[in-house]
Amino acid sequence: MKMTRRAFVKANAAASAAAVAGVTLPASATNLIVSSDQTKIKWDKAPCRFCGTGCSVLVGTQNGRVVATQGDPEAPVNKGLNCIKGYFLSKIMYGKDRVQTPMLRMKDGQYNKDGDFAPVSWDVALDTMAEKWKAALKKHGPTGVGMFGSGQWTVMEGYAAVKLMKAGFRSNNIDPNARHCMASAVGAFMRTFGIDEPMGCYDDFENADSFVLWGSNMAEMHPVLWTRISDRRLSHPHVKVNVLSTYYHRSFELADKGYIFEPQSDLAIANFIANYIIQNNAVNWDFVNKHTNFKQATTDIGYGLRDDDPIQMEAANPNSGAMSSISFEEYKKSVAPYTAQKASEMSGVSEEDLITLAKQYADPKTKVMSLWTMGMNQHTRGVWMNSLVYNIHLLTGKIATPGNSPFSLTGQPSACGTAREVGTFSHRLPADMVVANPKHRAISEKIWKLPEGTLNGKPGAHAVVQDRMLKDGKINAYWVMCNNNMQAGPNINTERLPGYRNPENFIVCSDPYPTATAQAADLILPTAMWVEKEGAYGNAERRTQAWYQQVQAKGEAKSDLWQIMEFSKRFKVEEVWGEELVAKAPEYRGKTMYDILFKNGQVDAFPLSEAQELNDDAKAQGFYVQKGLFEEYASFGRGHGHDLAPYDTYHTVRGLRWPVVDGKETLWRFKEGSDPYAKKGSDWDFYGKPDGKALIISAPYEAPPEVPNDEFDMWLCTGRVLEHWHTGTMTRRVPELYKAVPDALCYIHPADAKKRNLRRGDEVLISNKRGEVRVRVETRGRNRPPEGLVFVPFFDARILINKLILDATDPLSKQTDFKKCPVKITKIA
């Protein structure tokens, strides 16, 4: 091949530069650009789009496109590291099937439930939506509409959604997909401490002597945090790592001791540890006497099923969250049956191993960090299980000090910052307030400038009940934003899909890709992703982080915030509030919901000139909307233990952990000297409770609603893998991640495979009375279940494994148990 001298010099320069970077280029690569002016990449910070760890990344943009990402070396969370998903963030927005225009089901030029998707304008899309919402409101009132949101919403998007639904439509039928992942953690925080979110922080990783993972595969689900545990373990020989799970996974590789237990028996193990602490005189009496009270939970509370379900009808106290005061002696008596022998019989873990674990909690010189995610939260007694672990830490006083931390890890980037802190749950308001409390409603109405009585005091429909109401025709207009619940939620065939396809209902899905949810909807709205908009997230350690918009969205895609605000412009106050309420605020007569909720002198208080040049949402509204929403929202928590810094501050730092008082973040809550809200002289102050005392709550073992039988003889557990996130909407569109793990597999014990004449790679039918899926078996690899259990991840849209999951919930948190249901495995010839 001939090459000119100019071409040779150019190629040689490129090859020399590549060699320095450790990359080999072909000598004929003459099309490479070597001018720095043409290759300059602009870098800016943003929190990662995936899990709740809250890693900060540097985002590289060029020519209006994200071209690279890297770990942020200035970030205290990840210290320059990323997991495999984080390294490919630059590709999540550029899938070939990105939805770029609204798509409405149509036939003969008109909307038709049975029609095919066709592109329409934003005006047609939103006008059609508004027509359907008005019809549902007229037919059913505020309960006739609903919204299912996300722990991936930005703080501002979630806050705007809460205002639209609870203040605008006066409907509490809004819930986030965090109901599926964090509701049990929230429930236990509120019951035990009277205030939500962890008291510890990530600094605990560098201070603990023992780590105990309760139903958490951190090696794959929180890999950056796992590196901190690994570093602590490998750098300090005395440190121990304990992993409890119903099956072997990658976190066991570092563990000093692994504990495989029978599904649901974690309740017995936790009660045994409490009993061991008492029997071995390891109670920290000074702490317990000064800082705790004892309660007994109501038992036999059912499983959150439909009222006419035979399993639910057997419960003596269905859905009861009542507690009664008890003495320490009564508490001692309640855990006494959970001996090492009894707990071993129930769990399958040896007595010796159980005692090994209990000793680490009981030793006053050992700082213990307990960590958990879905194994504990996705549990029909998840609130109880969370509380039982708090009991252990409270009995020993191992709480809210460096290295002593019961720590609930979150799975989504803003499950804390948006779902929990903003209050996008059907029963909550911002800053831990609830709709059922008249004082909380009054505070919210005052901040939002609403007439008295606007907010509805009855909690709305949570995630599972929303499905049932759609199926029953009680919710007729429904908006799904920033999640893929048709794939992620339970009992798809029986409850959810019939509701989506109910002819009475109009379903809207806002998403960047044609997910299973989008394909089951009637209208798809194309959504801006991640750095295509400005926003803020809140991570698992209470760290709030903000970012600027860095590129424009593809096609006609708009942010969820823009969609919510534009939709609100289509409703006059008289159409949604009714004459009686409008009469209390005659100045609002004739105004739109947009005028009342978002042009209220607070949200629109900051001029467009304060925003960055690239801020499509601010330009659309004519004011700095993100700052206005954030500052109005922050007013709920300031002075009430949820203090946030001024919005602009978050653009100059790598996040701050609330409460932020006088510019200083809080590392350990409830501890005098660390938490500004802890009273002087208190030592510990659990100020979420009126008397400043946390609760030690007695709760027994109770069986799951279904167990294996002769026909359905195997346990099924669902979950995630390292390479994919949730339903794979983003990660399956990254070629490298898709190629690494293209298909979900059924991980099965070799003995169970042999019984069924199965070999690795064989296709099987996994079935129960709710449905069936086809999947290939894997007898080796990262996940190794014990005999009697199979594990199947839920990222694969071709294998909707969650259709097999019963929509049973923890009756207190309303969170579904995705970790245990009976199935049978049949070989496909």
Curated annotation (Swiss-Prot):
Catalyzed reaction equations: 2 Fe(II)-[cytochrome] + nitrate + 2 H(+) = 2 Fe(III)-[cytochrome] + nitrite + H2O
Annotated binding of Mo-bis(molybdopterin guanine dinucleotide), by residue: 85, 152, 177, 181, 214-221, 245-249, 264-266, 374, 378, 484, 510-511, 533, 560, 718-727, 802, 819
SUPFAM superfamilies: ADC-like, Formate dehydrogenase/DMSO reductase, domains 1-3
Highest taxon above the source species: Bacteria
Family the UniProt entry places it in: Belongs to the prokaryotic molybdopterin-containing oxidoreductase family. NasA/NapA/NarB subfamily.
Organism the protein comes from: Aliivibrio fischeri (strain MJ11) (Vibrio fischeri)
Function: Catalytic subunit of the periplasmic nitrate reductase complex NapAB. Receives electrons from NapB and catalyzes the reduction of nitrate to nitrite.
Entry's localization field: Periplasm
Signal peptide as annotated in the record: 1-29
Free-text comment on the cofactor: Binds 1 [4Fe-4S] cluster.
EC numbers, comma separated: 1.9.6.1
One annotated Gene Ontology cellular component of this protein: membrane
Binding site for substrate: 794
Subunit structure: Component of the periplasmic nitrate reductase NapAB complex composed of NapA and NapB.
Pfam families, alphabetized: Molybdop_Fe4S4, Molybdopterin, Molydop_binding
GO molecular function per UniProt: 4 iron, 4 sulfur cluster binding; electron transfer activity; iron ion binding; molybdenum ion binding; molybdopterin cofactor binding; nitrate reductase (cytochrome) activity
NCBIfam families per record: NAPA, PRK13532.1
One GO process term, biological-process aspect: cellular respiration
PANTHER family: PERIPLASMIC NITRATE REDUCTASE, RESPIRATORY NITRATE REDUCTASE
Protein name per its UniProtKB record: Periplasmic nitrate reductase
PTM notes: Predicted to be exported by the Tat system. The position of the signal peptide cleavage has not been experimentally proven.
Principal location: periplasm
Lineage: Bacteria, Pseudomonadati, Pseudomonadota, Gammaproteobacteria, Vibrionales
Domain 4Fe-4S Mo/W bis-MGD-type: 41-97
Names of the cofactor(s): [4Fe-4S] cluster; Mo-bis(molybdopterin guanine dinucleotide)
Positions bound to [4Fe-4S] cluster: 48, 51, 55, 83
Keyword annotations: 4Fe-4S, Electron transport, Iron, Iron-sulfur, Metal-binding, Molybdenum, Nitrate assimilation, Oxidoreductase, Periplasm, Signal, Transport
